[in-house]
């Protein structure tokens, strides 16, 4: 089963221009869904993505990428 990433294009802490290329680097075959995912509270202060329908958030994109990799290894 292919991995799926969901990212928000409305949340203040999410920078799609830098986040999407990093997610594609981790898994080029994953699907990436862009849109509101009703995660607005945490999305104001932390960058986040949903990895296979599970939320993953961090204060920096670098920390987020580490958490995404961990989530994918433990799936």
Swiss-Prot record:
One Pfam family, short name: DUF1450
Domain of life assignment: Bacteria
Origin species: Lysinibacillus sphaericus (strain C3-41)
Name by which UniProt lists this protein: UPF0741 protein Bsph_0950
Family: Belongs to the UPF0741 family.
């Amino acid at each position: 089963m292919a991995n799926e990433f969901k990212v928000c294009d409305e949340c203040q802490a999410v920078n799609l221009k830098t986040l999407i290329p990093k997610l594609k680097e981790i898994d080029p075959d994953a699907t990436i869904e862009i849109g509101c995912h009703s995660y607005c509270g945490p999305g104001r202060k932390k960058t986040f993505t949903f990895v296979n329908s599970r939320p993953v958030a961090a204060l920096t994109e670098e920390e987020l990428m580490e958490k995404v990799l961990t989530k994918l290894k433990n799936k």
